[in-house]
Amino acid sequence: MLVDSYGRVIDYLRISVTQRCNFRCLYCMPKTPFEWSAKENLLSFEELFMFVKVCIDEGVKKIRITGGEPLVRKDLYKFIAMISEYKQDIDLALTTNASLLKQQAKDLRQAGLKRINISLDTLKEDVAFKLAQKNILKDVLNGIDEALNLGFNVKFNTVALKGINDSEFIDLLEFAKVRKSQIRFIEFMENYHAYGDLKGLKSAEILNIIAQKYSFKQGEKSSNAPATIYELEDGYKFGIIDPHSHDFCDSCNRIRLSAEGLLIPCLYYDEALSIKKAIRNKDIAGACEVLKTVIKNKSEKNRWAENEANQSSTRAFYQTGG
């Protein structure tokens, strides 16, 4: 079992398999030109899996594959299969923009993937183009249909942006509701890579919009989950992830691994240690030591809690998966 200095059990690993993304979303990608990491600097699936085995053997029970956009990395399903074959009851999930999901969903399902979180910020083509800087909505919707048809457990994530998609919250909720999938509205997390004129909505503002049509009550919150759950009168449940108002640091159970091998204790801290050298030397004990050191050094609180006046992250979310 992995336990940090504050008694939190760390049993959730998020793996960013690539920095690359086929979208250029305003709230995530830098406006200025930048370069991707060279391929040789990235850990191979075999190298990532070597570390995954270390984590599972030490008590990790949940793994989420993220990016960038994870489906742009070739043969992702093979990595999924490695993990699910090693530990069949592992809670294994994927976060994706769904644009490439129609072509890959069947292979992912056969590899053992059961749960998918899909970023869905709008149902309007022009808004989707504005956000992603390309025509993507048709591919996203086709990917969603394919995932649901194959029986995946699907959740939707919507970043709440003032003046961009706030008029669609009820439509998005109903889109998810009809498909028997949960939607979570996420407060915009300010970061230095987002376009500077973006403004988010706080949880109270999101709830006020939904209350224009629906009555709801607050449900119970899972101790390790970031979302506060609300229930409509007909029993449908949706979530709000509100890091501005309610951090979940006290129950945080996660660490993050970048595609380059950086093990990151907190999304809002720049501190990280690399497992690359140990893994490429096949030094399993060394990799395990890095894991335990990162967990030991995990902060009690994120920097938002320490400095409300400067609520921006310097870390690129496309490198760590948010």
Swiss-Prot record:
Q: What does this protein do?
A: Catalyzes the cyclization of GTP to (8S)-3',8-cyclo-7,8-dihydroguanosine 5'-triphosphate.
Pathway listed for it is: Cofactor biosynthesis; molybdopterin biosynthesis
Q: How does it assemble?
A: Monomer and homodimer.
GO biological process per UniProt: Mo-molybdopterin cofactor biosynthetic process
Q: Which domain of life is it from?
A: Bacteria
Secretion signal, residue range per the UniProt entry: none
Q: What is this protein called?
A: GTP 3',8-cyclase
A Pfam family name for this chain?
Answer: Fer4_12
**Name of the gene this protein is made from:** moaA
Please give the InterPro entries that the UniProt record associates with this protein: Aldolase_TIM, Elp3/MiaA/NifB-like_rSAM, MoaA, MoaA_NifB_PqqE_Fe-S-bd_CS, MoaA_twitch, MoCo_biosynth_MoaA/MoaC, rSAM
Residue limits of the Radical SAM core domain?
A: 5-217
